């Protein structure tokens, strides 16, 4: 079975790509079991707990990440270097993730048959 990987690289709420990525990911999970999700660069902010979106008049879609368990999305990776550069740890995130180094991240991306970037 081919591996489908969703790559989140952008900060939330600056444009709609994060929300669109989550929507696409949850929809694809109904048809594909081999899904990985990777958060790198500013994409790690997508998972940041405690986001307050009311003041910027944006819908808070961060709780949708908590649906990953319900949709059997088990392979969720966050770049260790990206977290460190932003002064974050896995405890700052909404959901449990596997924090991986650059070499491990390259392996995940290399094993992907399809890569969708948001």
From Swiss-Prot:
Transmembrane segments: none annotated. It is found in: Cytoplasm. It holds the Pfam family DsrE. Keywords: Cytoplasm. GO terms for cellular component: cytoplasm. Its main location: cytoplasm. It comes from the Bacteria. Belongs to the DsrF/TusC family. Could be part of a sulfur-relay system. This is Protein TusC homolog. It comes from Vibrio vulnificus (strain CMCP6). The lineage of its organism: Bacteria, Pseudomonadati, Pseudomonadota, Gammaproteobacteria, Vibrionales.
